[in-house]
Regions:
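Feature activates predominantly on carbohydrate-active enzymes
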Residues: 1-63, 140, 152-167, 177-209, ...
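Gly/Pro-rich turn-and-neighbor structural signature
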Residues: 10-19, 55-183, 289
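Acidic, Ser/Thr-rich peripheral helices and adjacent loops at domain boundaries
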Residues: 44-51, 246-260
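Conserved, mostly hydrophobic/aromatic
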Residues: 161, 220, 232, 269-270
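Catalytic-core region of carbohydrate-active enzymes that cleave or remodel glycosidic bonds
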Residues: 203-231, 245-255
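Catalytic adenosine-cofactor/nucleotide-binding cores of aminoacyl-tRNA synthetases and other
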Residues: 239-242
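Catalytic domains of carbohydrate-active enzymes that cleave complex glycans
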Residues: 262-289
Length: 289
């Protein structure tokens, strides 16, 4: 969402597939497009000077958007991919609806819902035409899209609903009984890294205790969020412990006593301090706890 784009190098898909990695995109990047880095370069390459990232603009503009999404699906069709459906603005901005701006109140909300349902149908059609098989598809009811979902937006049963935390480690909402019964199931988008206005960001140092993360994810599991877990980690190196913990918890979740000794084990194996201790113990120069 914030840097580079997976599609920029065609070999990325093959390498990820070779390593057993399932690739997906965030809540604002549909059908494997990283809009912040792909939309404008793609328009320039195609020579489209009047297109906008807004599905409310009918006619040729919609056809250009469908072409943009379709080419991404074609590039990744041979790999294991999670496709995000729906639409928000470029780079985590709001849902663009310039053709609906004259509407107000409930009329505007109904028009937004109808538009988003149309977008999802058209995206599903692209996937069916290009893949000819079922694949993992997600929908993220987040920010302004959550309001539309709560007011009647119909999301196809096979789509996995991805719920988010509040950016500070607390899961805001669990699926209700009806949502738990969905064919596509439910997932979570959890932050160990957050890019926000000054004073709120924590990009490279996680401020959420692992014990709190465990409690929140355990409650999520117990409330039916069991299909897909996504962790926002920002930089890889500073959050190695959190990444390892998240992955191991996802593997063991549901088992009695899962992950109660993980932090101690990880510390003994992975930290520079313990590596120094092991080497010093061999020389018997001092004792380490």
């Amino acid at each position: 969402m914030h840097v580079n784009s997976f599609n920029a190098k065609p070999e990325n898909g093959a390498l990820a597939d070779q390593m057993g990695i399932v690739v997906g995109t965030s809540h604002c990047d549909m059908l494997m497009r990283s809009n912040n880095r792909e939309w404008y370069p793609w328009l320039e390459k195609k020579g489209y000077q009047d297109a906008v990232y807004d599905y409310s603009v009918p006619g040729r503009n919609r056809e250009i958007l469908k072409e943009y999404w379709r080419e991404s699906v074609q590039q990744n069709r041979n790999f294991e991919v999670s496709y995000t459906l729906g639409m928000r603005g470029i780079h985590d901005s709001g849902f663009e609806i310039r053709s609906l701006e004259k509407l107000e109140g409930e009329e505007l909300r109904k028009a937004k819902i109808h538009l988003l349902e149309t977008i999802i149908r058209d995206q599903e059609k692209i996937l069916q035409e290009e893949l000819g098989k079922e694949t993992l598809k997600t929908f993220v009811p987040y920010k302004e899209v959550l309001e539309l979902y709560d007011h009647g937006l119909e999301v196809p049963e096979e789509l996995t609903l991805i719920w988010s935390n509040d950016n500070y480690g607390h899961i805001r909402r669990y699926p209700n009984r009806k949502e738990q019964m969905r064919k596509g199931g439910n997932g979570i988008y959890y932050h160990n890294s957050y890019w926000a206005p000054p004073g709120n960001s924590y990009l490279f140092i996680n401020s959420i205790p692992i014990a709190h993360t465990r409690n929140e994810l355990w409650k999520a599991w117990e409330n039916g969020i069991q299909k897909l877990w996504v962790l926002n980690i920002g930089g890889l190196k500073p959050l190695e412990e959190e990444i390892s913990y998240f992955l191991q918890l996802g593997w063991e979740i549901g088992k009695p006593g899962a992950m109660t000794e993980d932090v101690d084990a990880w510390t003994k194996e992975e930290t520079v301090f313990m590596k120094v201790c092991r080497s010093r113990k061999k020389r018997r120069s001092f004792n380490c706890a």
